[in-house]
Design a protein with these regions (language model features):
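Extracytoplasmic small-molecule ligand-binding "clamshell" domains
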Residues: 28-100, 171
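Alpha-to-beta junction loops
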Residues: 71-73, 89-98, 142-143, 174, ...
Length: 256
C-alpha cells in the first residue's frame, strides 16, 4: 500500500513538473525584430557572396552586431536605392543601414545614428585608360558614370552647375552596373565613394583610382525615421559598445 501511494505521489510530481516546464516555455518573451533596409549589390557594404545567396558586407555585419547588442533579431530587407527612403517613410523597415551619408538635407527629414565610417568622393578609370583625370575638372568632355541619387550624383551636379563644365553623364540604379560599363568601354570614368572603390582596386584589378577628395569627408550613419528617438538612442548606445569593445574595428578591417 505504501509503495502504491509513493508511486502515485511520484507520478503526480512528475506531471506537475512537466506542466510547469511547459508553462515556463510558453511565457518566454519573444525577441523583437529589427527590420533593416539596404540595397544589396553595393560592395563592400552589402552584396552577395560567391554562392549567390549569402548576403555579406560591412553593413550586414554591423546590423547583426547592433541587433545582438540590443537583444533583437535582425531581418534584412533588400530595397532599390531610389526607393529606400520612401520605404522607411512607409514603415517597410525600422532603419536603413546602407552606406547612407549623413547630409544636412537628410537631417531635415530623418534621424541618424552617430557615424561609423568616413568616406570621400573619388574618380576611377581603367588602368590603361588614355585619359586619367587627376581632379574633377578634368572630367570635362568625358563620359562619366555614377549611381543615381547618391552623394556622387550631388557632387557632380554641383560641380557642373558651379563651373559650367560639360561632360556626358550617365546615371545607374546600381554601382555594379557603373563599373561593368566602365570595363567594357561605355564610360571613361566613374565617380563614386572611395569606400566602394576600394573593393574594385588592388592587385590584378582592371581599375585605377586617379583622384580622391582630400577635404570634407562624408560620414555614414544608420538612418532612422524622424521622431523615433527611442530607436536612435538604442542604436547609438549599441554602436558605442561596438566601438568600445573593438567589434566595429574588426568588421571594418575585414573589408578595408
Amino acid at each position: 500500500m505504501k509503495r502504491r501511494v509513493l508511486s502515485l505521489f511520484l507520478i503526480a510530481v512528475l506531471v506537475l513538473s512537466v506542466v510547469g516546464c511547459g508553462s515556463s516555455t510558453a511565457t518566454t518573451t519573444k525577441k523583437e525584430t529589427l527590420k533593416v533596409g539596404m540595397e544589396i549589390g553595393y560592395p563592400p557594404f552589402e552584396y552577395y557572396d560567391t554562392d549567390g545567396t549569402t548576403v555579406i558586407g560591412v553593413d550586414v555585419e554591423l546590423a547583426k552586431a547592433l541587433g545582438e547588442k540590443m537583444g533583437m533579431d535582425v531581418q534584412l530587407v533588400d530595397t532599390a536605392w531610389d526607393g529606400i527612403f520612401a520605404g522607411l517613410d512607409k514603415g517597410d523597415y525600422d532603419c536603413i543601414t546602407s552606406a547612407v551619408t549623413i547630409t544636412p538635407d537628410r537631417l531635415l527629414d530623418y534621424e541618424f545614428s552617430d557615424p561609423y565610417i568616413k568616406n570621400y568622393q573619388c574618380i576611377v578609370t581603367l588602368k590603361n585608360a588614355a585619359v586619367q583625370p587627376t581632379k574633377p575638372e578634368e572630367l570635362k568632355n568625358l563620359k562619366v558614370g555614377y549611381q543615381e541619387e547618391t552623394t556622387s550624383d550631388i557632387f557632380l551636379t554641383d560641380l557642373i552647375t558651379a563651373t559650367g563644365m560639360k561632360c556626358e553623364t550617365s546615371e545607374y540604379a546600381k554601382v555594379l552596373d557603373v563599373f561593368n560599363d566602365l570595363q567594357i568601354g561605355r564610360l571613361d570614368a566613374v565617380l563614386c565613394d572611395s569606400t566602394v572603390a576600394s573593393s574594385y582596386l588592388g592587385t590584378g584589378s582592371l581599375y585605377k583610382q586617379t583622384w580622391i577628395q582630400s577635404t570634407e569627408p562624408e560620414e555614414f550613419g544608420v538612418c532612422i525615421k524622424k521622431g523615433n528617438s527611442a530607436l536612435t538612442t538604442k542604436i547609438n548606445s549599441a554602436l558605442a559598445e561596438l566601438k568600445k569593445d573593438g567589434t566595429l574595428d574588426t568588421i571594418l578591417a575585414k573589408y578595408f
